[in-house]
Amino acid sequence: MTSDHEQAQYRPCVGLMVLNRQGLVWIGRRADAPNEPEGRGSWWQMPQGGIDLEEDPRAAALRELTEETGLRTVEVVAEHPKWLNYDLPSNLIGKAWGGRWRGQRQKWFLIRFLGDDSEVTLTPPPGHQMEFDAWRWAPLDQLPALVIPFKRSVYDDVIATFAPLVRPLGS
C-alpha cells in the first residue's frame, strides 16, 4: 500500500544557472514568505519556478528569470539533457504548494547575463511574491553549501553538467 504523498506528482519547473561575464553564478537568498517550503531567508539558491500549462520550458525559464531577478539581457548557453527531480522532506509533503506536489521535476538551463548589475531587481511584478531578499554573484564551488539540503543532489548534478561551460566571457 502506498501513501497519498507517494502518489503525488512532481511540480513541473525550470531552474537557471546564470553566469556573469566573470563566470560567477547568480544566487538569491530566499525571502521570508509564509508557508514557504524551500527555506525562509537562510538559504541561497539559483532562480527557479513553475512551468505554466502548455508553456515551453525554455520560455518558462526566461519568464521566471525576469520575474524573479529582473534580468533580461541574457542568452541561453545550454540546456541540461535530463529532467531532475527532488522530493520535499516528509514534514512538508501535503503542506507545501497546497499539498498538491511531492517535490519538483526541473529542467535546467545555463544562461549568460550580458547586462549590467543595475538590471537586477528583486521587486516582483504585480501579482507575484518576492522570491529573494538579497542576491550576489558566487563561485560555482560555493553553491552546494549554500542551498537547502533537500535540493543538494539536484545542484550537484547541475554543477557537474554545466561546470565545463562555466568560465569568464571571452576565455
What are the residue ranges of the model-derived segments?
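Short, glycine/charged-enriched secondary-structure capping and boundary segments
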Residues: 32-33, 41, 91-92, 125, ...
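Hydrophobic (often cysteine-bearing) scaffold residues that line and stabilize catalytic clefts
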Residues: 10, 57, 151, 155
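N-terminal strand-loop-strand
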Residues: 2-46
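Functional cleft and adjacent loop/helix regions within the main domain
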Residues: 43, 92-98, 128, 163, ...
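A periodicity- and composition-biased signal for non-globular, repetitive helical segments
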Residues: 17, 35-36, 54, 113, ...
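Short amphipathic alpha-helical segments enriched in hydrophobics
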Residues: 26-29, 69, 166
